[in-house]
Amino acid sequence: MNWDDNAYLISKNRYSENSIIAEVFTENHGKISGIIFGGTSKKIKNYLQVGNKIYVNYNTKSPTRIGYFKIEILKALTPLYFDENQKLSCISSAMNLVKLLAAEAQSNKEIFILIDKFFEVLASNNWIQEYI
């Protein structure tokens, strides 16, 4: 199984010396987990921040086994708010909600659109009223 899609990084965990297991929410495939080889390298670890929009190439031999991601950054959204603790906490909580509530490998474009709108709202001045 091989596909490409736009996604948001919703979580990441160290897997081995130089790899990570990432969980992403894609536009057409829903929540998917995969291994990113070299995910801890200086070259790509800086843009593997939770909440960033990425382009994902997913490969797996079997739908029941974990696959492998090759990724490219589309929009570095989280670094825009590194100096604003409230917005970073908001991003973290929103991505954790998606991680906990979304079903694995089930497409849900409404959630993807809501994540897009969430980052649009976060850029506005009255973001906290719209978020709540």
Regions picked out by a protein language model, each given a short descriptive name:
Residues 1-20, 25-132:
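Non-catalytic alpha-helical scaffolds and adjoining flexible linkers that form interface surfaces
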